[in-house]
Every structure is written in C-alpha cells, then in structure tokens.
Amino acid sequence: MLLAVLLCGCGGAQTDGEAVRTHFDALPGFEAHLKILSDLGQSVLEYEMDYVYNKEDTDSFTITAPESLSGIGGTIAGTDSASFTLQYDGLSLDDAMPQRTGLTPADAMFCLLDDLRTGEPAQVWSESASGTELAALKYEYDSEDGKIEKQVWLTRQGLQPVYAELYADGTRVLTIQVTEYRET
C-alpha cells in the first residue's frame, strides 16, 4: 500500500514536468522585462533588460539598467546558445559566450527556457506567493565544470515565468525576476 502511494506521488511530478515541457515547446514567443541580480562573490550587480523569445528565429535582449550599460543588446540563435552575438551601437562581437553557459545575465534566460522546453525536473512542487498559485521546478546538472542547479517558479495558471534562482556548486550566482510578461 505504501509503495502505491509513493508511486502515485512520482507520477504527479512527471505529469507536471511534462505539462511544462509541452507548454514551452509549443510557445511561439513572448516579451518580458527581467530584473537580474548577479552575485559574483565579491560584488553583486543588478541589471534590467527587455527579453524577446522567438521560437522560429533568434532570442534577443536589450539592457535597460544600469544606465551605463543601457542599450547594449544581444542575440542568441539555435537551441543551445552556441550562436551568441553581443551588439552595441551598430558594432557586433561574436563568440562572446562565457565558458560556463547559462549562468550569466546575458544567457541565463535563454538556457532556462531550454530547460523548460526539454529538461526533466528533479523536483516539482507547489507554492503560493501574494495570493498566486505557483508551480516550482528544480533542475540539476553535473558537468565537467561542476554542479549546476536551477529553480524556477511559474504561475500555476498559464505557466508564466515569475522568478528563478541559479546555483553553481551550491552557491547562488543569479536570480531572475520577471516583472512584465506577454506571450506573442
């Protein structure tokens, strides 16, 4: 009897993960405003950016804050951040990706979307914040660069991204807060 209860609990998590993959795989595009906090250990940097996801073409972003970086943008094409171009005022810098992809303000959302489209979450649970029901998912990866963990919170209704925390070797290095979101 206990085994049956445990197996039923596992099935629910798989269904939630499947629903998330199906939703993000079918999503044609969205526009979002992101607030990103990057914790480099010795300093914490805050960024804001407008992000555009386009399933059929490239993703793009434009930094809106801090003012000293405002206007810098980038594009990422393909399914794995292998094609990344940093742009500013008509100039482009190709191959600007860091060695440890998915943990920088420039590529975090792109890689997180790939996890939501294709990844199998290690854990799925429900939470409530400010009266909104949320689905929370945790993704874990071991690589030659170390352990990467990502936790993402989506609205239960509509599966809209709300917040994410990214960890490298157990240390939180990045948070993403989605303050505006519109599917296109």
Give, region by region, the residue ranges found by the protein language model.
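Sec-dependent N-terminal signal peptides
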Residues: 1-3
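Flexible, processing/modification-adjacent segments and terminal tails
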Residues: 25, 85-143
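Short, exposed beta-strand/loop patches in secreted or surface proteins that constitute
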Residues: 22-23, 49-54, 74-77, 122-130, ...
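An acidic-aromatic
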Residues: 53-111
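One face of beta-strands
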Residues: 28-36, 43-53, 57-63, 72, ...
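N-terminal leader/targeting segments and the immediate start of mature chains
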Residues: 5, 9-58, 68, 182-184
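Gly/Pro-enriched, hydrophobic low-complexity segments
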Residues: 60-65, 123-184
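Short, surface-exposed beta-strand/loop "edge" segments at domain boundaries and coil↔beta transitions
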Residues: 40-45, 67-73, 90-96, 144-150, ...
